[in-house]
């Protein structure tokens, strides 16, 4: 999986592990990277809260998906958390779309939030649904 870092100071193993485990379809291990009350915010869906719920959601919704992160940079950093902005692509059996991930880590290096946004316009996405 190619991973190009824009911010050369950014080298966070947890972020890399998130994408690696996701691409291996090891969703329990992916969810284990989250804090106990971690949140996954998929596009167009309600928030998924907690490791078990995240693992179940990924098993149901993400099987067959592959993510290709290409750029990562630190966006916010303070004593209580750090955020990374990642851009790349998501490939499904039906299409490939540009995406971004906002990933927040706590001081224990656990993921507290992954917010995923698709960087395509809604009419393009609806066209896939109609085919």
What spans do the regions from the language model cover?
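Short hydrophobic/aromatic segments of transmembrane alpha-helices and their interfaces
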Residues: 36-37, 94
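Short glycine/serine/threonine-biased micro-segments
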Residues: 36, 48, 86
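Short, low-complexity N-terminal intrinsically disordered segments enriched in polar/charged residues
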Residues: 1-24, 28, 32, 131
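Hydrophobic pocket/interface hotspot
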Residues: 18, 30-31, 38, 50, ...
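A beta-strand edge to alpha-helix "cap/lid" segment located at domain peripheries
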Residues: 2-3, 55, 59-131
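A short gly/proline-enriched turn/hairpin at secondary-structure junctions
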Residues: 39-48, 61-64
């Amino acid at each position: 999986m190619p991973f190009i870092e824009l911010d050369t100071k950014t080298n966070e193993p947890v972020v890399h592990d998130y994408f690696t485990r996701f691409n291996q379809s090891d969703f329990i291990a992916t969810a284990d990277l989250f804090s106990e009350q971690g949140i996954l915010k998929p596009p167009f869906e309600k928030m998924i809260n907690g490791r078990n719920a995240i693992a179940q959601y990924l098993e149901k919704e993400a099987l067959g998906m592959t993510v290709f992160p290409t750029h990562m940079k630190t966006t916010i950093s303070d004593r209580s958390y750090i955020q990374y902005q990642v851009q790349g692509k998501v490939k499904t059996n039906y299409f490939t779309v540009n995406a971004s991930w906002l990933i927040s880590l706590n001081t224990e290096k656990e993921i507290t939030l992954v917010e995923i946004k698709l960087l395509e316009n809604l009419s393009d996405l609806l066209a896939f649904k109609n085919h």
